[in-house]
């Protein structure tokens, strides 16, 4: 049938961890612990969505971070430096990720609504498997259990922005066509992943990395501040090529209804 058969969901900032704070805070701590180099939360967010080693590599190439590194060490960050920061990052992230495993508001009801429509729930993450093996059961205790998940280091081909994790979900879930899949993410590399896989893509402008607020901060934010931050996040996600941008996963069923109507008219992603 010419309709959406599966959604492939990101984790932090999409289904759990409103604001995607678990990885950002740990990057700051890992740089400090490994080399006594300070980076800001805003800098830590810039490459979000990539695999974590690649994320550290991208952070080292940010002009401001590179300038700090050059001032301290007289050279740019090396692969060995990235390995050292990653080695500091991993135990910190494994220890802390369960503290950020609660589903974002609306996720559980949305998953139930999608499953009621016969839609399968795939997922993938920029987290490596060692982190996912802690996060997945912790999220399950809170009621979020996707049908399949893939970690960024599971596949030889690699992770985002390549299509491979999304396509591995297609295979595992037995979906007949990539045009019958929707990739949902709160960061640009995840949107690129979906586009490269030939899927419809939906960006989340409020619940995730680009908006960058805790749930409590969001709840007390003025309408004006919300509007400014939403527009900033949405512009980045649209620039990455997202077909749709909404606030959070709670808005996804309406988007899928719209995509189903387009599929019925013969449209493709």
Swiss-Prot record:
InterPro entries with a match to the protein in the record: HAD-like_hydrolase_sf, HAD-like_sf, HAD-SF_hydro_IA, HAD_sf, PGP-like_dom2, Phosphonoacetald_hydro
GO biological process, one term: organic phosphonate catabolic process
Root EC class: hydrolase
Active site: 10 (nucleophile), 52 (schiff-base intermediate with substrate)
Pfam (any one): Hydrolase
UniProt-recorded name of the protein: Phosphonoacetaldehyde hydrolase
Family, similarity comment: Belongs to the HAD-like hydrolase superfamily. PhnX family.
Organism from which the protein derives: Salmonella agona (strain SL483)
SUPFAM superfamilies xref list: HAD-like
GO MF terms, alphabetically ordered: magnesium ion binding; phosphoglycolate phosphatase activity; phosphonoacetaldehyde hydrolase activity
The enzyme's E.C. designation: 3.11.1.1
PANTHER family: PHOSPHOGLYCOLATE PHOSPHATASE, PHOSPHONOACETALDEHYDE HYDROLASE
Keyword Glycoprotein: no
Subunit field text: Homodimer.
Keyword tags: Hydrolase, Magnesium, Metal-binding, Schiff base
Binding site for Mg(2+): 10, 12, 186
One GO cellular component term noted in the UniProt record for this chain: cytosol
Cofactor note: Binds 1 Mg(2+) ion per subunit.
Function: Involved in phosphonate degradation.
Gene that encodes it: phnX
Keyword Metal-binding included in the entry's annotation: yes
Reactions this protein catalyses: phosphonoacetaldehyde + H2O = acetaldehyde + phosphate + H(+)
Cofactor field: Mg(2+)
């Amino acid at each position: 049938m010419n309709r959406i058969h599966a959604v492939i969901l990101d984790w932090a900032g999409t289904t759990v961890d409103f604001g995607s704070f678990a990885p950002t805070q740990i990057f700051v701590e890992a740089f400090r612990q490994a080399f006594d180099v300070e980076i800001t939360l805003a800098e830590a967010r810039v490459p979000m969505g990539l695999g974590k080693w690649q994320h550290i590599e991208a952070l080292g190439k940010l002009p401001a971070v590179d300038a700090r590194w050059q001032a301290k060490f007289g050279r740019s960050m090396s692969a060995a430096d990235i390995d050292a920061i990653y080695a500091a990052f991993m135990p910190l992230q494994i220890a802390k990720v369960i503290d950020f495993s609660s589903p974002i508001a609306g996720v559980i009801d949305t998953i139930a609504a999608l499953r009621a429509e016969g839609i399968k729930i795939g997922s993938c993450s920029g987290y490596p498997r060692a982190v996912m093996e802690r996060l997945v059961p912790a999220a399950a205790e809170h009621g979020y259990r996707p049908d399949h998940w893939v970690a960024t280091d599971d596949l030889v081909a690699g992770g985002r922005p390549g299509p491979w994790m999304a396509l591995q979900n297609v295979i595992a879930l037995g979906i007949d066509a990539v045009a019958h899949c929707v990739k949902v993410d709160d960061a640009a590399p995840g949107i690129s992943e979906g586009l490269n896989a030939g899927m419809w893509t939906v960006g989340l402008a409020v619940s995730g990395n680009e908006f960058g607020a805790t749930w409590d901060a969001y709840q007390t934010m003025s309408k004006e501040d919300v509007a400014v931050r939403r527009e900033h996040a949405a512009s980045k996600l649209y620039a990455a090529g997202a077909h749709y941008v909404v606030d959070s996963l709670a808005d996804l069923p309406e988007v899928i209804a719209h995509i189903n109507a387009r599929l019925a008219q013969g449209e493709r992603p």
